[in-house]
Design a protein with these regions (language model features):
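His/Asp/Glu-rich metal-coordinating catalytic cores
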Residues: 1-176
Length: 176
């Protein structure tokens, strides 16, 4: 989702805010495109910044990639919340639970606009915790007699870590 930023940053000279992992990934893209990284600003959940008349509040959410945040944009006419893509996971692998309390606080105060993005949100039911995937890996690694092939997004760092941890547990080799 950050592939366009090197092109935008060539045209617009302004600060670019992101969490450490996001900016780390972006730095590789910038280098590939000959764009400097002096405008990058690291933020973390709980950070607040002011940009002109806007006050931004970064709120922890869960997603397949670690270090994800939503942004509450407090404007003179009301608050806009942009969630980015997120997943509700009450038991995330890294223990960093989504800040439900912050969303509730903003809800109590009133939100002008919620821009929410959650893959498969239109499907009924819920998505199990990423920890459940780890338990499935454990079962597969325990009983598999031959090679195991796992496909995942490269950004799904927690899933990749669970594969590696499970492979170590069962004395298996990992090839990426």
């Amino acid at each position: 989702h950050i592939g366009a930023l090197p092109y935008v940053m060539k045209q617009i000279d302004c600060p670019v805010y992101g969490t450490a992992l996001t900016l780390g990934i972006l730095q590789g893209r910038l280098k590939e495109n000959g764009v400097g990284n002096e405008n990058l600003r690291v933020v973390k959940p709980g950070d607040k910044i002011t940009a002109g008349a806007f006050k931004l509040d970064f709120i922890r959410v869960n997603h397949s990639i670690p270090d994800a945040v939503a942004i509450a944009i407090n404007t003179p006419i009301g608050t806009i919340i942009h969630t980015g893509d997120f997943k509700i996971d009450h038991t995330p692998v890294d223990g960093q639970v989504m800040e439900f309390n912050k969303f509730a606080e903003y809800g109590d105060r009133g939100v002008l606009c919620l821009m929410a993005d959650s893959t498969n949100a239109e499907r009924p039911g819920f998505t199990p915790s990423e920890k459940m995937v780890g338990q499935t890996f454990d079962e597969e690694f325990r009983y598999a007699k031959h090679r195991i092939i796992v496909a995942t997004f490269s950004s799904n760092v927690h899933r990749i870590q669970q594969v590696i941890d499970t492979a170590i547990k069962y004395d298996r080799k990992v090839a990426v």
